[in-house]
Regions:
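N-terminal Rossmann NAD(P)H-binding glycine-rich loop of SDR-like oxidoreductase domains
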Residues: 39, 43-47
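NAD(P)H cofactor-binding loop motif with strongest signal on the N-terminal glycine-rich segment
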Residues: 37-38, 103
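Residues at the starts of beta-strands that form the adenosine-phosphate
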Residues: 32, 56-57, 120, 145
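C-terminal hydrophobic helical "lid"/dimerization subdomain
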Residues: 157-209
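Adenosine-nucleotide cofactor-binding segment
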Residues: 51-106
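Glycine-rich phosphate-binding loop and adjacent beta-alpha segment
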Residues: 106-172, 207-208
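NAD(P)H dinucleotide-binding glycine-rich loop of Rossmann-like/cofactor-binding domains
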Residues: 1-33
Length: 209
């Protein structure tokens, strides 16, 4: 269970938020879904879940050497992180039916502008910053919805439902393949890699190691 942890629970919540477009909102069927920070703990599991749901997953990463890793998780397409840098128009061509954003920051400006009518952007991270410079056009012209994901505030009923769905949507052998078991000493050695963005996947601390 700790292989999934809060990251896995958050990824499940994000994926169900994206799915809400066709279920709760009775919108068009979801097809193309963008996942930012795709090599991270939440992103990796989200790629896997969304692919299992039958969506075409477009994974965003700054790590060119992880393309095969993301394809193995189910990503159909890999997009470089730089594609979401720089200035954005008020509205751009609608590309994404749904988005799982684990990064936050300036990239969201372009993501909002590229989301299709009725699309849902599930936001759960702030590694890229806490400020968003955007405009109201995606929201009032296309009905784009920003869906904040607060995993810690989920009710017991919601937790029971989400964890009950995990076995159907997550390949635990794949999660195990990108999960590292660390001792306390190894954890201290790993922190610099985390800060530099050189660590990917999941880490579990084993106090007996």
């Amino acid at each position: 269970a700790m292989m999934l942890g809060t990251a896995g629970f958050t990824a499940l919540l994000c994926s169900f938020a994206v799915k809400a477009k066709e279920e709760l909102l009775l919108g068009e069927k979801v097809k193309d879904v963008l996942v930012t920070g795709a090599t991270g703990g939440v992103g990796s599991i989200a790629v896997m879940i969304l692919s299992k749901m039958g969506y075409d997953v477009h994974a965003v990463t700054g790590k060119k050497d992880k393309n095969d890793y993301l394809k193995n998780l189910g990503a159909k397409n890999i997009i470089g992180r730089k594609e979401f840098e720089g200035e954005s128009k008020l509205l751009e061509k609608g590309v994404w039916d749904g988005v799982v954003d684990t990064v936050g920051g300036s990239a969201l400006t372009k993501i909002f502008a590229q989301t299709k009518p009725g699309g849902i952007v599930a936001a759960c991270g702030n590694a890229g910053g806490i400020k968003i410079n955007t405009n109201v056009m995606p929201f009032i012209i296309r009905g784009v919805k920003l869906w904040g994901i607060d995993s810690s505030g989920s009710s017991i009923k919601r937790r029971e439902f989400v964890w009950g769905e995990a076995a159907k949507l997550i390949d635990f052998s794949k999660v195990q393949s990108f999960t590292k078991e660390l001792s306390f000493t190894e954890l201290l050695e790993t922190y610099p890699k985390l800060l530099k963005g050189e660590f990917f996947g999941r880490a579990i601390v084993n106090p007996n190691k």
